[in-house]
């Protein structure tokens, strides 16, 4: 069983309850007027429950789980990983939003850095939860600041939200950009350098 985690200090949640999720999906199918016992839907509740277990796996991880490996290389210039794929779920409508994240930091004066893949894994920890893009962006930045203790952090997330594309206002292709900037990267010149690297194609 996965240990419970605490989200934003608002209490803990336990391990994923696959049977309960399966029963809930079955009830949802009935609620929308479908027959969950017909051939095409008979296995759907189980499939959806297993999919949700994967999609929301970040609920049962902490950033410390992925930022475990650090190196003291004496590198004191910016480290930036661009175009990290983001797949997340809007907590308001439980439909996907997807796009890319750009994550950069200026290492501490000790030169402590983490593996590049760890930055992508950190994005996944927070993306694989019911989310809003603004909080996702902030959580990534705050985790890097608290765990790596760098001199500065910048996180830019650019996503298309299916809740805007397939329902409501129905504007497919519209993208939302959010950013979180901490420490020395708030200096206008340093921030401009980071943004020029992020926006370069």
Swiss-Prot record:
EC class name: hydrolase
Biological process according to GO: one-carbon metabolic process; tetrahydrobiopterin biosynthetic process; tetrahydrofolate biosynthetic process
Superkingdom, natural source: Bacteria
GO cellular component terms attached to this protein's record: cytoplasm
EC number in record: 3.5.4.16
Pathway: Cofactor biosynthesis; 7,8-dihydroneopterin triphosphate biosynthesis; 7,8-dihydroneopterin triphosphate from GTP: step 1/1
Keyword annotations: GTP-binding, Hydrolase, Metal-binding, Nucleotide-binding, One-carbon metabolism, Zinc
Reaction(s) this enzyme catalyzes, per UniProt: GTP + H2O = 7,8-dihydroneopterin 3'-triphosphate + formate + H(+)
Binding site for Zn(2+): 90, 93, 163
Family annotation (Gene3D superfamilies): 1.10.286.10, 3.30.1130.10
Chain ranges passing through the membrane: none
An example molecular function term from Gene Ontology annotations: GTP binding
Family: Belongs to the GTP cyclohydrolase I family.
Assembly information from the UniProt record: Homomer.
Name recorded for this polypeptide: GTP cyclohydrolase 1
The gene coding this protein: folE
